[in-house]
C-alpha cells in the first residue's frame, strides 16, 4: 500500500505512467455489429493507452463482442473443458459404452464387429450431444476460448472503461499543475533560389514574413503610360479569367502590378507555328518563314512553268466585266476578225469602221477588203453618196483584233482640200468566187477607231441612208433612173470615184472582179418585216460579251458571227427619218420592179425596219450559206443576188438580246 501511494506521488515514476495509461501494452479485438459503438470504444481504448488489432490471434489480450454467448463465460469454459466425443474414433475407444473396452482387448476383429454392431439408439445419442454444443466449431468465440483470450461483452467493456477513466481523472486532479514554457518557433529553412533579372523583390526587415518577388521578361518603364512588354496582349482572352497560380505570390496579393494593365488579361505570344509543305519543314513564325530565302527560291523557281505555259495558251485575257454594266447601248455592224492562216504577214490598211449607235438610231456601215487593182478596174468604179447629218462622229467602239491590227487603229484618212472628198485607199484583195461558199475565207476585217480630230464632212444633199461606193454592177442591174444625188459625185480622170469626207457612220461596200456579164436587172427584195418570226429552226452561234471600253483588248480574241434582233419599245418615240439596219440574207418576198423609184430608195428597202418604234438588238439570219454558192448554171439575176447576200457574215437568230463579243 505504501509503495502504491509513493508511486502515485512520484510523477516521474513508471507507476504514474501506468495510472495515466492503464491499457498500455494491451491488444483489443472488437467483434461488434454497430459501427458507432465500435468507433467510440476504439477512441477510449486509445486514450487509455490500448491498441486495436484487426485480426484475431493468440496475442490478443481482450475480445470485446456483442454476442449473447459472451455473457456466460464461465459456463463456456466448463463446456469446453469436457473432452469431445469425437475423440473416441481417434483412440479406437468409446467413452459411452464400457463394453467397447472389452472389445478393444480382443483384437482388431472385435473392433470391426463393434462398428458394425452400433445400434440406432447410440447414433441418436451422438447426434444429441452434437446439437447440445453451444459454440460452433471454428468460430471466433470457440477459438478465443481455446487460445486463452479473455472474452468481454460490450456492456461489460463499457463499464470497465468508464471505471478506468474516472480513476484517471482523480489522479490528474491530485497532481500539481506544472507550467511548460513555450519555446520560440524556429525559423523554417527555405532553400535559396536565384532570381533572373529583371525582377522586383519586396522583403520584410524583421524577416517574419516571406519576401514577395516578381520576375519580368522586360523591365517596365514608369514614364510611359503603356507597358513595354515584348509580348502582345491576346485580345480574345477573357478579361475575367484569372492567371494560373504560380509560385510568385504577387499574383495573389496584387503587389507590384502596374495600374495601367489589367492583371487578369492573359499574355500570349503572337506566333503561328506550322508546317510548310513547299519547303517540307516546320516553322515557328509564319511571317519570318515567308520572307526566308528558302521559301522565296521555291516560289520563284521553275516549278510553276507548266502552269504558266497552260495559261499562255488561253484565247482570252482575264477582264473584269463588272466595269461594263450598261448593256442597253447598241453597236453597229460588228464583224469579228478571223485569224489569218499565214502568221507573220503584215495586214496593211484594212479597216472596218463601226459606229456607236446613240439610242439605237445611228447609221451603220461596213467595209470589206479591196484588191489593190480594184480601183483601177473600169467595171468597179463605184458611185459616191454623201452621208446624212443624222450620223454621229462619236468615238468608235473598240473590239479585240488579230495581231497586227493595232497599227491600223486611230488612223486618219488623207483629205483633199479642193474637193472635200475622201480618197479610197487600196486594201488587201480576196477572191469573191472562192469565198461565197458560206464564208469570206481568208478575208480579214478589223475594227478601227475614228480619230476624234477628223475634220467635219462637207455638207451635201441629205438622204436617209448611208451606203456609199456601191459597185457599178449593182447600179447597172437597177432600173436606170436619173438620181439627183449622183450629179454631185466628182470623178477623176483615172475613173476612180471618191466620196465626200466620211464620218463615223460611213463606209464602203466594195467588190472584186465582178462579172461584166451581169448586166441584167436584179430583183431586190422587199422590206423585211417578218424575219424574226422564223427564228425557231435556226442554230445559235456563239456570242461573245461586248466590252464597252475605249481601250483596245489583246489581239488574240476569237472570231465569230453576230445576230441582230429588233424589239418593240413603247416608251421611246423614234424619228421616222432614222433608219435601223436589219440585215439578213434570207428574204421572204422579192420586190417587183418599179421604174418610178430611185436606185437609192430600192437599196434603202434592205435596211428599212418593219416598225417605227423599235430597238436594235442584233442581227438575225440563217447559218446555212449553201444556197449562196454560185453555180455555173445560175442566171445573172441569181448571181448578183448571191453576191449581194454574201457580203454579210453568217448570222443566227436568237431569242436573247445582242450582248457583243
Swiss-Prot record:
Classification via InterPro entries: BRCT_dom, Replication_Regulatory_Kinase, Znf_DBF, Znf_DBF_sf
Segments forming domain BRCT: 18-111, 136-161
A GO term, aspect molecular function: protein serine/threonine kinase activator activity
Any GO CC annotation of this UniProt entry: Dbf4-dependent protein kinase complex
GO BP field: positive regulation of nuclear cell cycle DNA replication; regulation of cell cycle phase transition
Keywords: Cell cycle, Metal-binding, Nucleus, Phosphoprotein, Repeat, Zinc, Zinc-finger
Compartments reported by the entry: Nucleus
Membrane-spanning residues: none
Regions of compositional bias (Polar residues) in chain numbering: 246-264
Highest taxon, organism lineage: Eukaryota
PANTHER family, per the entry: ACTIVATOR OF S-PHASE KINASE-RELATED, PROTEIN DBF4 HOMOLOG A
Protein name according to UniProt: Protein DBF4 homolog A
Organism listed in the record: Xenopus laevis
Gene: dbf4
Amino acid at each position: 500500500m505504501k509503495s502504491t501511494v509513493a508511486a502515485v506521488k512520484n510523477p516521474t515514476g513508471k507507476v504514474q505512467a501506468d495510472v495515466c495509461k492503464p491499457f498500455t501494452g494491451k491488444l483489443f479485438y472488437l467483434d461488434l455489429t454497430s459501427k458507432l459503438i465500435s468507433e467510440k470504444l476504439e477512441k477510449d481504448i486509445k486514450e487509455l493507452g490500448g491498441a486495436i488489432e484487426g485480426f484475431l490471434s493468440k496475442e490478443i489480450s481482450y475480445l470485446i463482442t456483442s454476442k449473447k454467448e459472451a455473457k456466460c463465460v464461465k459456463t463456456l469454459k466448463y463446456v469446453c473443458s469436457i473432452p469431445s466425443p469425437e475423440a473416441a474414433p481417434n483412440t479406437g475407444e468409446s467413452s459411452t459404452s464400457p463394453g467397447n473396452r472389452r472389445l478393444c482387448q480382443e483384437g482388431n476383429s472385435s473392433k470391426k464387429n463393434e462398428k458394425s454392431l452400433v445400434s440406432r439408439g447410440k447414433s441418436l445419442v451422438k447426434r444429441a450431444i452434437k446439437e447440445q454444443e453451444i459454440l460452433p466449431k471454428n468460430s471466433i468465440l470457440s477459438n478465443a476460448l481455446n487460445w486463452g483470450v479473455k472474452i468481454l461483452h460490450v456492456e461489460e467493456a463499457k463499464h470497465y472503461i468508464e471505471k478506468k477513466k474516472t480513476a484517471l481523472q482523480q489522479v490528474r486532479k491530485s497532481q500539481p499543475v506544472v507550467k511548460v514554457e513555450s519555446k520560440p518557433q524556429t525559423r523554417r529553412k527555405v532553400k535559396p533560389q536565384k532570381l533572373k533579372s529583371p525582377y522586383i523583390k519586396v522583403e520584410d526587415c524583421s524577416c517574419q514574413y516571406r519576401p514577395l518577388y516578381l520576375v519580368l521578361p522586360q523591365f517596365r518603364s514608369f514614364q510611359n503610360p503603356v507597358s513595354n512588354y515584348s509580348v502582345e496582349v491576346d485580345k480574345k482572352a477573357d478579361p475575367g479569367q484569372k492567371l494560373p497560380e504560380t509560385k510568385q505570390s504577387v499574383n495573389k496579393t496584387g503587389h507590384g502590378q502596374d495600374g495601367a494593365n489589367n492583371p487578369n488579361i492573359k499574355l500570349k505570344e503572337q506566333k503561328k507555328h506550322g508546317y510548310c509543305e513547299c519547303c517540307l519543314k516546320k516553322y515557328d513564325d509564319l511571317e519570318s518563314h515567308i520572307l526566308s530565302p528558302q521559301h522565296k527560291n521555291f516560289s520563284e523557281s521553275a516549278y510553276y512553268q507548266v502552269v504558266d505555259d497552260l495559261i499562255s495558251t488561253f484565247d482570252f485575257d482575264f477582264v473584269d466585266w463588272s466595269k461594263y454594266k450598261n448593256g442597253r447601248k447598241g453597236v453597229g455592224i460588228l464583224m469579228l476578225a478571223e485569224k489569218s492562216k499565214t502568221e507573220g504577214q503584215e495586214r496593211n490598211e484594212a479597216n472596218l469602221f463601226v459606229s456607236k449607235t446613240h439610242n439605237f438610231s445611228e447609221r451603220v456601215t461596213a467595209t470589206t477588203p479591196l484588191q489593190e487593182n480594184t480601183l483601177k478596174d473600169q467595171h468597179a468604179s463605184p458611185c459616191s453618196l454623201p452621208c446624212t447629218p443624222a450620223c454621229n462622229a462619236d468615238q468608235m467602239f473598240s473590239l479585240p483584233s488579230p495581231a497586227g491590227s493595232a497599227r491600223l487603229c486611230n488612223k486618219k484618212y488623207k483629205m483633199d482640200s479642193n474637193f472635200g472628198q475622201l480618197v479610197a485607199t487600196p486594201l488587201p484583195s480576196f477572191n469573191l468566187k472562192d469565198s461565197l461558199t458560206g464564208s469570206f475565207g481568208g478575208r480579214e476585217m478589223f475594227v478601227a477607231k475614228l480619230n476624234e480630230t477628223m475634220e467635219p464632212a462637207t455638207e451635201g444633199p441629205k438622204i436617209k441612208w448611208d451606203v456609199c461606193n456601191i459597185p457599178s454592177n449593182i447600179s447597172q442591174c437597177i432600173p436606170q433612173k436619173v438620181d439627183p444625188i449622183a450629179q454631185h459625185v466628182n470623178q477623176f480622170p483615172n475613173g476612180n470615184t471618191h466620196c465626200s469626207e466620211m464620218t463615223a457612220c460611213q463606209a464602203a461596200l466594195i467588190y472584186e472582179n465582178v462579172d461584166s456579164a451581169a448586166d441584167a436587172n436584179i430583183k431586190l427584195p422587199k422590206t423585211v418585216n417578218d424575219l424574226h418570226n422564223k427564228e425557231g429552226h435556226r442554230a445559235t452561234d456563239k456570242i461573245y460579251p461586248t466590252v464597252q471600253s475605249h481601250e483596245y483588248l489583246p489581239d488574240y480574241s476569237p472570231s465569230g458571227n453576230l445576230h441582230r434582233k429588233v424589239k418593240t419599245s413603247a416608251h421611246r418615240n423614234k424619228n421616222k427619218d432614222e433608219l435601223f439596219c436589219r440585215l439578213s440574207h434570207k428574204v421572204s418576198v422579192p420586190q417587183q420592179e418599179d421604174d418610178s423609184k430611185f436606185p437609192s430608195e430600192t437599196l434603202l428597202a434592205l435596211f428599212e425596219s418593219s416598225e417605227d418604234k423599235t430597238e436594235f438588238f442584233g442581227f438575225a439570219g440563217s447559218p446555212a450559206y449553201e444556197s449562196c454558192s454560185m453555180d455555173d448554171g445560175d442566171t445573172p439575176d441569181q448571181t448578183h443576188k448571191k453576191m449581194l447576200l454574201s457580203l454579210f457574215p453568217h448570222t443566227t437568230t436568237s431569242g436573247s438580246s445582242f450582248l457583243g463579243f
